[in-house]
Amino acid sequence: MDVFMKGLSKAKEGVVAAAEKTKQGVAEAAGKTKEGVLYVGSKTKEGVVHGVTTVAEKTKEQVTSVGGAVVTGVTAVAQKTVEGAGNIAAATGFVKKDHSGKSEEGAPQEGILEDMPVDPDNEAYEMPSEEGYQDYEPEA
């Protein structure tokens, strides 16, 4: 019976150690992702695309050190983070929007960027006209 209990104890220690390593890997991946997003925010127009790539690469590096089902979750979080950073970059005018008007899934993209005129010669962006906007008055 002692041998059986000792074996279970060692197995429990192994599971605890594996869980701690996974937790540490996820925490490191989150930290690297945060660093990458902050890096994107600090870059100028020319550096944004490189910054988004850096976020993806740093997250991918950390994900490879994490095992099992956690990888799927971290990858999904990293993908959403990179998509969000790209959307922020496009919304602030740092990068040009895809002229096809389609997202990766093939669905039409909607939003204010569709109406934004682009001058490809000097990459200048103009604010869309205020036609179609309604004044918002909050209720008291």
Swiss-Prot record:
PTM note says: Phosphorylated, predominantly on serine residues. Phosphorylated on Tyr-125 upon osmotic stress.
Q: Which UniProt keywords apply?
A: Acetylation, Cell projection, Copper, Cytoplasm, Membrane, Metal-binding, Nucleus, Phosphoprotein, Repeat, Secreted, Synapse, Ubl conjugation
One Pfam entry name: Synuclein
Which stretches does the entry tag as region Interaction with SERF1A? 111-140
Residues the record lists as Phosphoserine modifications: 129
Q: Where is the protein situated, by its record's location annotation?
A: Cytoplasm, Cytosol; Membrane; Nucleus; Synapse
Could you tell me which InterPro entries the record lists for this protein? Synuclein, Synuclein_alpha
Region feature (Disordered): 97-140
Residues the record lists as Phosphotyrosine modifications: 125
The record's Gene Ontology biological-process terms are: chemical synaptic transmission; regulation of dopamine secretion; synapse organization; synaptic vesicle endocytosis
The principal localisation class reads: cytoplasm
Q: Does the keyword Nucleus apply?
A: yes
Q: Name one GO cellular component term.
A: neuronal cell body
Q: Name one GO molecular function term.
A: identical protein binding
Q: Where is the composition biased (Acidic residues)?
A: 112-140
Family matches, as Gene3D superfamilies: Helix hairpin bin
Residues annotated as carrying N-acetylmethionine in the record are 1
Q: Per its UniProt entry, which superkingdom is the organism in?
A: Eukaryota
Q: Does the keyword Membrane apply?
A: yes
Q: Indicate the family of this protein.
A: Belongs to the synuclein family.
Note the subunit structure: Soluble monomer. Homotetramer. A dynamic intracellular population of tetramers and monomers coexists normally and the tetramer plays an essential role in maintaining homeostasis. Interacts with UCHL1. Interacts with phospholipase D and histones. Interacts (via N-terminus) with synphilin-1/SNCAIP; this interaction promotes formation of SNCA inclusions in the cytoplasm. Interacts with CALM1. Interacts with STXBP1; this interaction controls SNCA self-replicating aggregation. Interacts with SNARE components VAMP2 and SNAP25; these interactions allows SNARE complex assembly and integrity.
Mind telling me what this protein is named? Alpha-synuclein
Biological source species = Ateles geoffroyi (Black-handed spider monkey)
**Gene responsible for this protein:** SNCA
